[in-house]
């Protein structure tokens, strides 16, 4: 689900009435025997926030918590975590040309890194489980960052564990082996955890290869009076948004929701 209550409802997420609401009033009026309908409240005041830039970043790989060590893969729940993201880390054997990484299964969205460089993603929605990885030296660091995107709460898929649910295998030179010897980092989605991160001046949101740098980005802006507004993240990728410590919602470049609705207090 998107972070929104606007499922084509008669009243929008921001509290404004829609044409559907007007049609409903017209229909109901036919059966009210001339009784007067209640007055529609005025729209909630909105404000415009001038464009602002993010000035600080806490890179993910420089701000990891203490890991847990495990020989084999386990789910997020088995590491006492119910939501957020989780990072699985191990080392790779020497890969002369290329190899195929198979993750069974990543719930729900996995980003793959080798020695800190983004290689690709595995999206559960699309049934993606395999990724080709390039040649690398023995001991190269493999990171699999898995985000839990919400739980299925009906039907046969209700048993919906998060993280990597079974195993990770590498097909290298015609031989398939299960990767073992993992360090596991719990990355819970709690604002208290973000406050302790080490931020540094933001020079670019992309690395030398043009890939977005995973991490926590921070900006400061001021409003003169309280009001409702929408924060536009159309040029960003995938992540979570907090304002003054309050979780506003998820953003994702694929849509359908390019903006996040929020109420701002003067500060």
Predicted regions and their residues:
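Carbohydrate-binding surfaces of carbohydrate-active enzymes
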Residues: 1-204, 223
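Functionally critical, mid-to-C-terminal surface segments that flank or help form catalytic/ligand
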Residues: 84-85, 206-230
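Residues that flank catalytic or metal-binding motifs in active/ligand-binding sites
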Residues: 88, 108, 217, 237, ...
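Preference for bulky hydrophobic residues occupying beta-strand positions
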Residues: 90, 144, 219-221, 231, ...
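Aromatic-lined ligand-binding clefts that engage carbohydrates, nucleic acids, or primary amines
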Residues: 98-113, 221-244, 251-252
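A short acidic/small-residue loop/turn micro-motif
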Residues: 120-127, 249-257
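Short strand-edge motifs at loop-to-beta-strand transitions and within beta-strands
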Residues: 127-131, 219, 258-260
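Conserved small/polar residues in nucleotide/adenosyl-binding loops
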Residues: 262-267
């Amino acid at each position: 689900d998107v972070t929104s209550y606007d499922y084509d409802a008669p009243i929008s997420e921001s509290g404004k009435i829609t044409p559907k609401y007007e049609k409903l009033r017209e229909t109901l009026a036919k059966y009210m025997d001339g009784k007067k309908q209640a007055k529609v409240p005025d729209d909630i005041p909105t404000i415009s926030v001038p464009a602002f830039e993010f000035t600080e970043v806490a890179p993910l790989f420089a701000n990891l918590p203490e890991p847990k060590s495990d020989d084999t893969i386990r789910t997020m729940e088995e590491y006492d975590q119910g939501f957020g993201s989780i990072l699985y880390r191990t080392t790779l054997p020497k890969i002369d040309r290329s190899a195929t990484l198979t993750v069974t299964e990543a719930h729900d969205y996995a980003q793959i890194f080798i020695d800190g460089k983004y290689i690709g993603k595995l999206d559960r929605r699309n049934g993606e489980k395999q990724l080709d990885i390039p040649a690398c030296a023995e001991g190269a660091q493999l990171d699999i960052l898995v985000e839990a995107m919400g739980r299925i709460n009906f039907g046969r898929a209700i048993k919906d564990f998060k993280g990597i649910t079974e195993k990770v295998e590498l097909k290298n030179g015609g031989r398939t082996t299960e990767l073992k010897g993992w360090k596991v980092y719990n990355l819970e989605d709690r604002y208290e955890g973000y406050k302790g991160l080490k931020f540094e001046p933001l020079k670019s949101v992309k690395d030398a290869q043009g890939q977005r740098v995973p991490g926590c980005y921070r900006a400061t802006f001021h409003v003169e009076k309280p009001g409702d507004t929408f924060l536009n993240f159309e040029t960003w990728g995938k992540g979570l948004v907090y304002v003054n410590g309050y979780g506003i919602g998820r953003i994702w470049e694929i849509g359908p929701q390019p903006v996040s609705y929020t109420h701002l207090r003067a500060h």
